[in-house]
């Protein structure tokens, strides 16, 4: 489960600006769902090699109707889920009753809180921060998010240590969870009312999840262990992710976080699409998130029953056009969760994807495949020199990570990287899982000797003079 940073505070203090700084600065995948242009509320960001999620809770002002109730729902859910809270206040306008209310909520929680005093450009930082110490939090820091003043220092000072500690503990916990995990852990993701809960019940063979014919019946993720044909599984039915313009209920907003975390905790992700509505930007966002996080993937196109042949052809053409990047390795099944049509094939693809993602490859095999790929198609020239790939080894599983060492590898074009991925995928018969390639510059064993020789020669020439 990813580390979560919650940005809380009243309206117009600069939360969204800080959100953009945290995400866009670190090669972020931001969930800019259709239907909203003003606020991007959910984002994945990176610090060094560590991923984390950021949520902007939206602004609240004293003039809002139902202030207490809305704030309690909106901010408390974010605070409860968060590993670190950035409590943003306005250094220009000073302390307000809205700030005091947020502070009172935070004091009730056992959370790590940093009071971020924003908009301090052109002011005395110490003076701007002074009154906010009255909240009782020992961490108060001044920034200007709009001008990125002190924002990197904010991350280095408060996020770095907490993030590293979290992932050290998390790694140990995950190792224990993997030992205790009930078989293959897979999640069902998709928009509301695409049939995830119906598919869950069909896979379980009983009505374990309440289903109504209305969007958003499942508010939170439901995790259920079961066994089928001797294979153990744990299925997670996530709440649906709808268009941002339609995300109105506060609980539903934070179900997005649950969905993203369920993806990260899964061995395999089953993306469920409504055949009659087609694939949407929300579906694509979730699929991209799963791939970016290295999850094995299966696509289930539901509600296939009752469609005309003409409509089916149109759906397949639309899928081929929008999912061109998945055509070569992800299984797509056209199913009816209600009647059970082709659901068995979904299980087969889950098993295959998991087996491929967990497949053990030796260093000898990885190097041999790399050599065969190079023999079939050599890397391009870089100036007067050809890029040379020397050897390969496996850097991890689920997803498979292939580490290739060589010279000039930083100049290897993306087209050749795609060629290597396709070559390895075909040779290893990998289905359903991404393959991650890492390229490392080989160390020159004579570099230190050359440097020493140069220094010695320099010393000798000085003596001759």
Swiss-Prot record:
Residue sites binding GTP 1 per the record: 9-16, 56-60, 118-121
Protein residues bound to GTP 2: 190-197, 237-241, 302-305
The KH-like domain, residue ranges: 359-443
Domain of life from the UniProt record: Bacteria
Domain EngA-type G: 3-166, 184-358
Disulphide connectivity of cysteines: none
InterPro entries per UniProt: G_ENGA (IPR031166), GTP-bd (IPR006073), GTPase_Der (IPR016484), KH_dom-like (IPR032859), KH_dom-like_a/b (IPR015946), P-loop_NTPase (IPR027417), Small_GTP-bd (IPR005225)
GO molecular function: GTP binding; ribosome binding
One GO BP: ribosome biogenesis
Keyword Thylakoid attached: no
CDD domains linked: EngA1, EngA2
Region of interest: Disordered: 446-465
SUPFAM superfamilies the record matches: P-loop containing nucleoside triphosphate hydrolases
Keyword list, A-Z: GTP-binding, Nucleotide-binding, Repeat, Ribosome biogenesis
Pfam families with a match to the protein in the record: KH_dom-like, MMR_HSR1
Record has Mitochondrion as a keyword: no
Function field: GTPase that plays an essential role in the late steps of ribosome biogenesis.
Family classification: Belongs to the TRAFAC class TrmE-Era-EngA-EngB-Septin-like GTPase superfamily. EngA (Der) GTPase family.
Quaternary structure (record): Associates with the 50S ribosomal subunit.
The name this protein goes by in its record: GTPase Der
Gene of this entry: der
């Amino acid at each position: 489960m990813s580390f979560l940073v919650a940005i809380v505070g009243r309206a117009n203090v600069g939360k969204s600006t800080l959100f953009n700084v945290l995400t866009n600065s670190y090669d972020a995948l931001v969930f800019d769902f259709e239907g909203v242009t003003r606020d991007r509320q959910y984002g994945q960001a990176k610090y060094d090699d560590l991923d984390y999620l950021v949520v902007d809770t939206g602004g609240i002002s004293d003039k809002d109707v139902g202030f207490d109730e809305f704030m309690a729902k909106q901010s408390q859910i974010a605070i409860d889920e968060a590993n670190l809270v950035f409590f943003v206040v306005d250094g220009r306008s000073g302390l307000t009753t809205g700030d005091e209310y947020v502070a009172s909520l935070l004091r009730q929680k056992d959370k790590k809180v940093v009071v971020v005093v924003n908009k301090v450009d052109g002011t005395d930082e110490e003076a701007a921060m002074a009154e906010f110490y009255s909240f009782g939090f020992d961490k108060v820091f001044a920034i200007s998010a709009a001008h990125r003043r002190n924002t990197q220092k904010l991350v280095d000072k408060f996020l770095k240590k907490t993030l590293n500690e979290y992932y050290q503990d998390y790694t140990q916990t995950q190792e224990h969870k993997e030992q205790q995990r009930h078989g293959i852990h897979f999640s069902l993701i998709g928009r509301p009312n695409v049939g995830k809960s119906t598919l869950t019940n069909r896979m379980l063979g009983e009505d374990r999840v309440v289903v109504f014919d209305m969007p958003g019946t499942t508010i939170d993720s439901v995790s259920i262990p079961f066994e089928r044909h001797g294979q153990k599984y744990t299925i997670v039915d996530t709440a649906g992710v709808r268009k941002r313009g339609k995300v109105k209920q506060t609980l539903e907003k934070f179900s997005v976080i649950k969905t993203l975390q369920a993806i990260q905790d899964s061995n395999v992700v089953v993306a469920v699409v409504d055949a009659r509505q087609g694939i949407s930007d929300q579906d694509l966002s979730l699929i991209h998130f799963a791939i970016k996080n290295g999850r094995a993937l299966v696509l289930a196109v539901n509600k296939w029953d009752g469609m005309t042949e003409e409509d089916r052809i149109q759906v397949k053409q639309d899928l081929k056009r929008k999912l061109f990047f998945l055509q070569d390795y992800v299984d797509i099944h056209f199913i009816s969760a209600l009647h059970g049509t082709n659901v068995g094939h979904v299980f087969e693809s889950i098993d295959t994807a998991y087996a491929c993602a967990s497949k053990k490859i030796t260093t000898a095999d990885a190097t041999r495949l790399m050599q065969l790929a190079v023999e079939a198609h050599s890397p391009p020239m870089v100036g007067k020199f050809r890029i040379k790939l020397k050897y390969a080894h496996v850097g991890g599983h689920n997803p498979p990570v292939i580490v290739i060492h060589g010279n000039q590898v930083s100049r290897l074009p993306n087209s050749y990287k795609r060629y290597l991925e396709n070559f390895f995928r075909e040779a290893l018969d990998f289905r359903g899982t991404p393959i991650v390639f890492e390229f490392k510059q080989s160390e020159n064993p004579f570099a230190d000797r050359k440097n020493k020789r140069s220094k010695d020669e320099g010393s000798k020439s000085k003596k001759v003079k």
